[in-house]
Structures are given as C-alpha cells and as structure tokens.
C-alpha cells in the first residue's frame, strides 16, 4: 500500500496558512460575545441568588425579633394580638437620658442584668444608669460566640458599657466595665480582659 504525500509550498502554502489563521480569528470573534453573554448570565444568576437569599434572611430576622402577645379576654371569641414594642439601636441614636425610657428599650435579660448591677452598686437616676462614676449602658451575653468576637451595640450618649458575660443575667460569670474611649463595635475576648471587674473590685 502506497501512501501519497502531498506537499504544499510557495504561494499555495502561504494562502492555506493565512486561511487557517483567518478562520481561527473569525471563530474567536464569534465565540467571544457568546462567552461574555454566558458569563453575564452566570454572574447575574449568582448576584440575584445572593440578593434573594439576603432578603429572605432579613425578613426572617425581622419576624423572629418581634414578640407577639396573644390575649383572649373577649366574650365573643375575638382574639386580640399585641406586638411588643421593641426599638432597635440604630446609629447610636437610642435615647438614654430617661431611666424609664431606657428600661423600656431593654429586653428581659438585659433588664434583669441592669437590676443585678443596681444590686451591686449601680444607681438608677432620672437621666440613666450610673456605675462607678460612669453613665453606663448594660449589655448581657449568655455565652461566648464561636469566634470569640463580641458584638457591642450601644448609644452615643453614655460614658461606658458594662458587659455581663455567661452565667445568668442576675448572676453573670464575667463582668466588664469598658469606658467609651476604648469601645468598638466588635471586641475580642482578649481585648476585654483588661476591663474585667473582679470580685475584690465589686466588694
């Protein structure tokens, strides 16, 4: 069996090489818009999926944080539903210049913690809570977060935050007095240690 070998040279060879390169360029020009369109569709899908997921997470969070009280006091079978008033701290604009208003803002655990502070020396004055010479805002966290980073949300018009950590709000295991100049929105456990209030200080 003989194998025929064709040799292309001269102008014909140059023409074939030029033709192949031209076809490759045309293919690249045609494929590039398709590739860009596919990338845009994929990117849009990822972005839309993230936004939808974030939206439903926010809705679920807002639903969970609302406290619902159901009262059945009517005689005609009607049920009255009351949503508990709870105002979130936004941008440090919570009003703390009135003790009654401040206590109304606090959830049950934090309010119980505030009364614990009162039992160990804090003063409930008309314009807020005072502890060891500072106008303070109480925060209670029942447990350490996994990453050991404590999120602190506090109003602007205070001198310090008193943080109760672990245990119960009426008997926290750790107590920290953090002056305002050292406060951050997120603080690690190691950062908090320097502000811990020991038993001797409380006594």
From Swiss-Prot:
Q: What is its main location?
A: membrane
Instruction: Tell me the membrane topology, using the record's own terms.
Output: Multi-pass membrane protein
TM ranges: 14-34, 36-56
Origin organism of this chain?
Methanocaldococcus jannaschii (strain ATCC 43067 / DSM 2661 / JAL-1 / JCM 10045 / NBRC 100440) (Methanococcus jannaschii)
Q: Which UniProt keywords apply?
A: Cell membrane, Membrane, Transmembrane, Transmembrane helix
Instruction: Give the subcellular location.
Output: Cell membrane
Q: Which GO terms describe its cellular component?
A: plasma membrane
The name of this protein is Uncharacterized protein MJ1017
């Amino acid at each position: 069996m003989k194998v025929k070998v064709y040799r292309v040279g001269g102008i014909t060879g140059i023409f074939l090489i030029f033709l192949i390169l031209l076809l490759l360029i045309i293919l690249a020009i045609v494929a590039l818009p398709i590739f860009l369109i596919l990338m845009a569709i994929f990117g849009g899908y990822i972005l839309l999926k993230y936004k939808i997921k974030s939206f439903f997470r926010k809705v679920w969070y807002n639903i969970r944080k609302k406290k619902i009280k159901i009262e059945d006091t009517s005689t005609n079978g009607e049920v009255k539903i009351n949503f508990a008033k709870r105002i979130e701290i936004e941008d440090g604009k919570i009003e703390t210049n009135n003790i009654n208003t401040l206590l109304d803002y606090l959830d049950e655990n934090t309010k119980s913690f505030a009364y614990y502070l009162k039992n160990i020396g804090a003063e409930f004055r008309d314009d807020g809570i005072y502890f060891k010479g500072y106008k303070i805002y109480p925060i209670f966290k029942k447990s350490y977060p996994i990453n050991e980073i404590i999120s602190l949300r506090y109003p602007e018009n205070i001198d310090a935050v008193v943080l109760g950590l672990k245990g119960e709000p009426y008997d926290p295991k750790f107590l920290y007095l953090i002056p305002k100049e050292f406060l951050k929105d997120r603080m690690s456990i190691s950062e908090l240690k320097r502000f811990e209030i020991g038993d001797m200080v409380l006594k």
